[in-house]
Amino acid sequence: MALALSFSQEEGDGLFLCNWAKYLKLDEELEKIEARSDLDDLSDLRNLIQREPDFLDARVSLGMHCYRNDDFGNAKAVAETGLAVANELIPARFKGTIAWLRVENRAFLRLLSLAALSNARLGRHGEALAHIMRSMKYNPDDELGLRGVLGSELLRTGEDATAKRC
């Protein structure tokens, strides 16, 4: 049984959909992996991603592990690879929101945040700003708090006038 990640639009809002029964089984497996004290051995997490590439939550877990260990290059790579999976599902013409209130959207929004923060730590401020702006467009309520780094990234990219309005 595959996870079968897809994207749906309802009244202008976007929603990632999947086989919920499969998701719950994968989430349980992910929780067991994350609970282990030997998480420095990431092979089980990498194997889960390889086996279920649409399971974005596993990518968030791996990326956050890299980020917490100051491995910003790998955190960025993991986030952007996960975003590539999700982006293939979002229609180019989609202009709506992807709300945090929908649990199904949270992994995608976390990947956007991780990509923004990793790029910022790597000094790739233009890329960081692009991810922040995209996240704010999709999720204007900004539950992940990227608005807090928006001004700094605007200044770092030379957009002083815009930064002053933030």
Label every PLM stretch briefly.
Residues 129-164:
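Hydrophobic, aromatic-enriched interface-forming segments
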Residues 92-113, 144-157:
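TPR/TPR-like alpha-solenoid helical repeat scaffolds
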Residues 1-98, 115, 119-141:
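N-terminal alpha-helical interaction modules that lie
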Residues 24-31, 61, 110, 114, ...:
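"A position-specific structural signal for the A-helix of alpha-solenoid helical repeats
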